[in-house]
From Swiss-Prot:
Family the UniProt entry places it in: Belongs to the SmpB family.
Transmembrane helix among keywords: no
One of the record's GO molecular function terms: RNA binding
CDD domains: SmpB
One GO cellular component term noted in the UniProt record for this chain: cytosol
BP GO terms, sorted: trans-translation
Coiled coil: none
Natural source organism: Ehrlichia canis (strain Jake)
Domain of life: Bacteria
Subcellular location: Cytoplasm
Protein function: Required for rescue of stalled ribosomes mediated by trans-translation. Binds to transfer-messenger RNA (tmRNA), required for stable association of tmRNA with ribosomes. tmRNA and SmpB together mimic tRNA shape, replacing the anticodon stem-loop with SmpB. tmRNA is encoded by the ssrA gene; the 2 termini fold to resemble tRNA(Ala) and it encodes a 'tag peptide', a short internal open reading frame. During trans-translation Ala-aminoacylated tmRNA acts like a tRNA, entering the A-site of stalled ribosomes, displacing the stalled mRNA.
Protein name as catalogued: SsrA-binding protein
């Protein structure tokens, strides 16, 4: 599994409820830009339209060597999932407080582009502070244990 990009802020800003692996419908110039790692998922999110899931605000830069028919960098891209998974995710999208965002993009063993999408719930400020405290405490523990 060749990870292209990972959105590490998701783990800090949200509680992760459930993870899914989804295929992405892309065109050729988008795949070539992905292989060059010219992509940003910081503002990306998943929406549901007509019982299909779409990845919005995923910015894949235009491929420099493509012909005049290059892709739109922020166009919505269809996600490929099983029907059961689509029902589960779309039900959570409709619930208040839940969001679906991409955690990472990667190429699988067959060379296909995949997105790891997660159902998340937003953290409050005190939860974020608690995360920082536990991370610092774990770092300090490992330093002390290495020192002995």
């Amino acid at each position: 599994m060749d990870v292209i990009i990972e959105n590490r802020k998701v783990r800090f800003n949200y509680f992760i409820i459930q993870e899914f692996d989804a295929g992405i419908v892309l065109i050729g110039s988008e795949v070539k830009s992905l292989r060059q790692r010219k992509v940003s998922i910081a503002e990306a999110y998943v929406t549901e339209k007509n019982m299909e899931l779409w990845l919005c605000n995923l910015h894949i830069s235009e491929y420099n060597h493509a012909s005049t028919k290059n892709h739109n960098p922020t166009r919505p891209r269809k996600l490929l999932l099983r029907k059961k998974q689509i029902y589960k995710i779309s039900g959570n999208i409709k619930n208040d407080g839940f969001t679906v965002v991409p955690l990472s993009l990667y190429f699988n063993e067959k060379g296909l582009a995949k997105a790891k999408i997660v159902i998340v719930k937003g953290k409050k400020l005190h939860d974020k502070r608690e995360t920082i405290k536990t991370r610092d405490w774990n770092r300090e523990k490992s330093r002390v244990l290495r020192g002995n």
